[in-house]
UniProtKB/Swiss-Prot annotation:
Zn(2+) 1 binds at H74, H76, H130, D154. Monomer. The lineage of its organism: Eukaryota, Metazoa, Chordata, Craniata, Vertebrata. It catalyses: an S-(2-hydroxyacyl)glutathione + H2O = a 2-hydroxy carboxylate + glutathione + H(+); (R)-S-lactoylglutathione + H2O = (R)-lactate + glutathione + H(+). The gene is HAGH. It comes from Callithrix jacchus (White-tufted-ear marmoset). Keywords: Acetylation, Cytoplasm, Hydrolase, Metal-binding, Mitochondrion, Transit peptide, Zinc. Substrate binds at K163, F164, Y165, H193, E194, Y195, R269, R270, E271, K272. Pathway: Secondary metabolite metabolism; methylglyoxal degradation; (R)-lactate from methylglyoxal: step 2/2. GO terms for molecular function: hydroxyacylglutathione hydrolase activity; metal ion binding. Zn(2+) 2 binds at D78, H79, D154, H193. Belongs to the metallo-beta-lactamase superfamily. Glyoxalase II family. Its cofactor is Zn(2+). This is Hydroxyacylglutathione hydrolase, mitochondrial. GO terms for cellular component: mitochondrial matrix.
Length: 280
C-alpha cells in the first residue's frame, strides 16, 4: 500500500506544447486528470474538469494566464465536484457542460455548439453513454498547423472506454466510431483518468496477437514507473490497440463471439466489467 500512496504523490504534471495551444496535464485525486488549455496568443485559458480548484488557481498563476472558462465533461463528482468552489475563487468564469446536474453551470453545451478560448475554437460533442449528458471538447487553432486536441472525459480512455452507467452499447459505438473516430487521425486524446495499464492488459486479453497492444503496454509501464502521464494518445493509435475502437475488426468480433460492432461492444464491455487484472 505504501507504494500506492507514494506513487500518487509522485504523479507528475506534463506540458504539451505543439504550437499556439498549450496543454498542461494536471494529475488530480488518485487517478484523475484535469487539463489547463492555454491559448499562447492571448494568454487566456480554459480548465477541463477542475476537481481540485486550488491547484487550478495556482497553475493558472504559475503560467501567467487568465482563466476564463470551465469545460465540464460530465456531472460525476470527480469531474464536476470542484466547479462551485472554483467559481467562488475566480468569479465570472463561464462554466460549460451538457447536463443540468453539473454544479455551477452557466452555459449548456449542445452537440456541435462552439465557443472560443482566446483564439482557440472549442466544439462541444455530445457523447451520451457513461452519463446521459456527457460532452467531449474538440479544440483547434484556426489556421494553425498544430494537431487538434479532444478532451474525452470518461467516454474514451487510452485503450479503453467508460462504463455504460446511463447508456447503451449502441450509444458508445456512435460516440467512439461516428463522433470521435471521424476526427483527424493525429488528434491528441486527453482522457479523464489514468487507467492505461489496466486497459492495455484487458486489450491484450482480447487480442493476444496484437503487437501494438504489447508495445503500448511496455511503454505505459515505463511511464508509470517514473510517475509520468500516459496521455495524450492519438486517435490513430487508439484504432490500433483500443478494443472498444476496434469492434469492427474481425479479431475483436471473434473474441466476443459476434459479427457486428454493437453486440461486440456490448460483449466486450460486459467482459471488461468482470475482468480480473493480472499482475504482470
Amino acid at each position: 500500500l505504501l507504494g500506492v500512496f507514494h506513487h500518487t504523490d509522485l504523479r507528475k504534471s506534463l506540458t504539451v506544447d505543439e504550437g499556439t495551444m498549450k496543454v498542461e496535464v494536471l494529475p488530480a485525486l488518485t487517478d484523475n486528470y484535469m487539463y489547463l488549455v492555454i491559448d499562447d496568443e492571448t494568454k487566456e485559458a480554459a480548465i477541463v474538469d477542475p476537481v481540485q480548484p486550488q491547484k487550478v488557481v495556482e497553475e493558472a498563476k504559475k503560467h501567467g494566464v487568465m482563466l476564463t472558462t470551465v469545460l465540464t465533461t460530465h456531472h460525476h463528482w470527480d469531474h464536476a465536484g470542484g466547479n462551485e468552489k472554483l467559481v467562488k475563487l475566480e468569479p465570472g468564469l463561464k462554466v460549460y457542460g451538457g447536463d443540468d446536474r453539473i454544479g455551477g453551470l452557466t452555459h449548456k453545451g449542445t452537440h456541435l455548439s462552439t465557443l472560443q478560448v482566446g483564439s482557440l475554437n472549442v466544439k462541444c460533442l455530445s457523447t451520451p453513454c457513461h452519463t446521459s449528458g456527457h460532452i467531449c471538447y474538440f479544440v483547434t487553432k484556426p489556421g494553425g498547423s498544430q494537431p487538434p486536441a479532444v478532451f474525452t472525459g470518461d467516454t474514451l480512455f487510452v485503450a479503453g472506454c467508460g462504463k455504460f452507467y446511463e447508456g447503451t452499447a449502441d450509444e458508445m459505438c456512435k460516440a467512439l466510431l461516428e463522433v470521435l473516430g471521424r476526427f483527424p487521425p493525429d488528434t491528441r486524446v486527453y482522457c479523464g483518468h489514468e487507467y492505461t495499464i489496466n486497459n492495455l492488459k484487458f486489450a491484450r486479453h482480447v487480442e493476444s496477437g496484437n503487437a501494438a497492444v504489447q508495445e503500448k503496454l511496455a511503454w505505459a509501464k515505463e511511464k508509470y514507473s517514473i510517475g509520468e502521464p500516459a496521455v495524450p494518445s492519438t486517435l490513430a493509435e487508439e484504432f490500433t490497440y483500443n478494443p472498444f475502437m476496434r469492434v469492427r475488426e474481425k479479431t475483436v468480433q471473434q473474441h466476443a463471439g459476434e459479427t457486428d460492432p454493437v453486440p461486440t461492444m456490448r460483449a466486450v464491455r460486459r467482459e471488461k466489467d468482470q475482468f480480473k487484472v493480472p499482475r504482470d
